[in-house]
Amino acid sequence: MMWGTKLLPVLLLQHVLLHLLLLHVAIPYAEGQKKRRNTLHEFKKSAKTTLTKEDPLLKIKTKKVNSADECANRCIRNRGFTFTCKAFVFDKSRKRCYWYPFNSMSSGVKKGFGHEFDLYENKDYIRNCIIGKGGSYKGTVSITKSGIKCQPWNSMIPHEHSFLPSSYRGKDLQENYCRNPRGEEGGPWCFTSNPEVRYEVCDIPQCSEVECMTCNGESYRGPMDHTESGKTCQRWDQQTPHRHKFLPERYPDKGFDDNYCRNPDGKPRPWCYTLDPDTPWEYCAIKTCAHSAVNETDVPMETTECIQGQGEGYRGTSNTIWNGIPCQRWDSQYPHKHDITPENFKCKDLRENYCRNPDGAESPWCFTTDPNIRVGYCSQIPKCDVSSGQDCYRGNGKNYMGNLSKTRSGLTCSMWDKNMEDLHRHIFWEPDASKLNKNYCRNPDDDAHGPWCYTGNPLIPWDYCPISRCEGDTTPTIVNLDHPVISCAKTKQLRVVNGIPTQTTVGWMVSLKYRNKHICGGSLIKESWVLTARQCFPARNKDLKDYEAWLGIHDVHERGEEKRKQILNISQLVYGPEGSDLVLLKLARPAILDNFVSTIDLPSYGCTIPEKTTCSIYGWGYTGLINADGLLRVAHLYIMGNEKCSQHHQGKVTLNESELCAGAEKIGSGPCEGDYGGPLICEQHKMRMVLGVIVPGRGCAIPNRPGIFVRVAYYAKWIHKVILTYKL
């Protein structure tokens, strides 16, 4: 009986061990994948930096590797008793990694510059805050909350204990630093050097509280790297598990350091992509500052009568969009549901139904009271006056000699002398080098849309500068179409109302879809480029991963068209010149031209089309029917001159050289929501061309109200310049 009593625990232990072994064997593949996932997100990166040590006894390990990711994985595994990796340097040119048991905060260690080196430091060892219970904290705080110095972990004086470094490997019980080896409530703690106080917690703040946020957190640059549900953030310079466009080199002013929470696109608060493949992104839990003290450079200038910059500081009472349609109240969900509410954007002054720019769009805007037009810009609000000095330009700015050296997207201009080879590629004359000073905005190629400059960003090789025309120097009105014309031929959804179904020969027509839902039309002008309206992408920092370009389809609902359709991702947006309402979409890969997919020609620059020329618009938009069939439709319009167009609009419209007017041949036909971005196609000398782009109008196909389109011929040189220079 005694023998059986002794044997029972042994048998029980064997049973438990066998059960654990079976569990180990049955670990799913997904968990194994998780263990092998990239660990670079656990490190803080310092570009072009290396470490030098004064103590020759400090060991360094080195090995040739393929990438910084491999360096990180090996560093995390190097947590032995004699060597614990706290940082590494990756030599990009030699593909070599150097692992260090110290970091930049260690005594006798200095940072140094190295063009080919990138320093990565394990954030657990350098952060001055904790996440959750602080079980991963490995910082150097060694004072308790009440100010008592901590007792070393390997000492038994004045308090005996069992928390020995050898018993808690991996918990970094070094020196007398505060730790939480068991992950207990209260956070990191230590035994104290006071015989009367055995142990006490340390005063280490939560990472969510180290830096508070003001407004919606657009200027937040704190160290929070977990979402509000506890998911670890994905690094901004990584594309796995989620592909995105917010690359640090593309947006140098957005603070895309490592994997910290940020708000680059006007969301209600900071967020990040997550390492969970099933959760693309989540918000982060960051406290709001008690006082709205914020860097003055981050605060837009408040105006009430005009727009400064992109109008983020506009606080006036204009409450209609550019064509007179009243705005929907921000606190209303009718007729359009949305999340840009006064509660979510408390500091954006979303009062009443006034035009505002809460999300960093191109200018103030609002949801409209028209159920068929979701969003409209308030472009009738004038720009604030610019001075008549060197910070404005006349004509097309070819004689501008100011000192501005930043693009409209905030990128610093690149030196002209480093870009002369690229400049010679798209102009046919020798530029005046005396005007190309340093990296100042200039117009050496006689661009019709103003000064510009090259950038150091390969994704945005060049862009226009935020300089306005001088006061009194306005865009000229379009010529009367009765005069001789230059030949165009070379040797929210808007919908076509009451159009007739088209044939399948319009292979240049593109359906732009967001999460599989049609939102806009577009025109395939080159195998890799689509021309559409910027209203389809109102925020400059729009994430493109949920957008697709569908080509070769006649039925937007995809019925019976699986064989001929092509579905392509969008890799880049290129916004048109200021006020153009155009955007070019770079496709992730070129379209394959066949019987169902083709390109449409562009008109010659500056050409005009004769009045009364019959043209056509195409779209999948609103048809006036409750159960729309989803078929591509066409409506025929005729070109209308400036004077007649103005009469139909009760004298409220005066066309300029960037606009085109066309009226319906059939009463009640015209563009409506769902057709935004689609083309106005005209034929001249047996050549079909995209002469106009559909942009929001006043209502849908209103009788005797001709539509106003973006005149593509006015922007033809810009389109060709982008296609020639945007290579990535």
UniProtKB/Swiss-Prot annotation:
Keywords: Disulfide bond, Glycoprotein, Growth factor, Kringle, Pyrrolidone carboxylic acid, Repeat, Serine protease homolog, Signal
Residues linked to a glycan: 295, 403, 569, 656
Pyrrolidone carboxylic acid: residues carrying this PTM: 33
Signal peptide: 1-32
Ranges of residues in domain Kringle: 129-207, 212-289, 306-384, 392-470
Disulfide topology: 71-97, 75-85, 129-207, 150-190, 178-202, 212-289, 233-272, 261-284, 306-384, 327-366, 355-378, 392-470, 413-453, 441-465, 488-607, 520-536, 615-682, 645-661, 672-700
Keyword Repeat belongs to the record: yes
Any one GO CC term of the record: extracellular region
InterPro entries associated with the record: Hepatocyte_GF (IPR027284), HGF/MST1 (IPR024174), Kringle (IPR000001), Kringle-like (IPR013806), Kringle_CS (IPR018056), Kringle_sf (IPR038178), Pan_app (IPR003609), Peptidase_S1_PA (IPR009003)
Domain Peptidase S1: 496-724
Cited function: Potent mitogen for mature parenchymal hepatocyte cells, seems to be a hepatotrophic factor, and acts as a growth factor for a broad spectrum of tissues and cell types. Activating ligand for the receptor tyrosine kinase MET by binding to it and promoting its dimerization. Activates MAPK signaling following TMPRSS13 cleavage and activation.
Subunit structure: Dimer of an alpha chain and a beta chain linked by a disulfide bond. Interacts with SRPX2; the interaction increases HGF mitogenic activity.
Name the UniProt record assigns to this protein: Hepatocyte growth factor
